[in-house]
Amino acid sequence: MKKICSSIFRVLVIPYVMCGFVAAQNSYTLNGLSELKEFTAGSVEETVENLTLIEPEGSEMIPESEILKLTDRVKKITGTLTMEGLSQLTTTTGLIDVIDCSEAGFVFRDCPVLSNMYAFADEDKFSVIHGDFIIENCPRVMTGAATAHLDKSFSKIREVQGDLKLTDITTAMNKPQKI
């Protein structure tokens, strides 16, 4: 019996460990400030697949300072980061440049004061977006098409491997137009 167990261990367990098995990653949808606070109160920093933060209409506003606390809890995002309806979010800086989002896709939807997309200017991390790049109804977001804004925003992105959708944003700093 001992010989059989030893053989099973060599055939099944050792290759399992040697192949660098990676456990499934968690995905999270956080609806509102209380769920965000509960999530960020956790002490384990982890890699997540998808992370969605939603400020439901009519709910308590989520302060940007609370959103940025995600960096203490999330080490890396390998799927999609979705930020939806966040009435206080003004910047990507301090969030996607701190969390490793180099393999992630992004959805920013209905964020009325989001304007600073400067974290995407990091060409090493974000020249290729490994998923969707969707910005919808974020009227203060600028494309970086203006000369003064050329090295900022998301003008360094060269490829989007998923869906690309830009609606209701400002096209250039010197000529505000909606696209």
Feature annotation, model-predicted:
Residues K2-I4, I8, V22-R73:
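N-terminal capping/linker segments that flank leucine-rich repeat
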Residues L30-L33, N50-I62, I77-Q88, I96-V113, ...:
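Concave beta-strand-loop units of leucine-rich repeat
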Residues S6, Y16, A172-M173:
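Serine/threonine-rich, low-complexity intrinsically disordered segments
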Residues R10-G20:
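Bacterial N-terminal signal peptides
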Residues C5-S6, V13, K76, Q161:
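Sequence-pattern detector for short linear motifs
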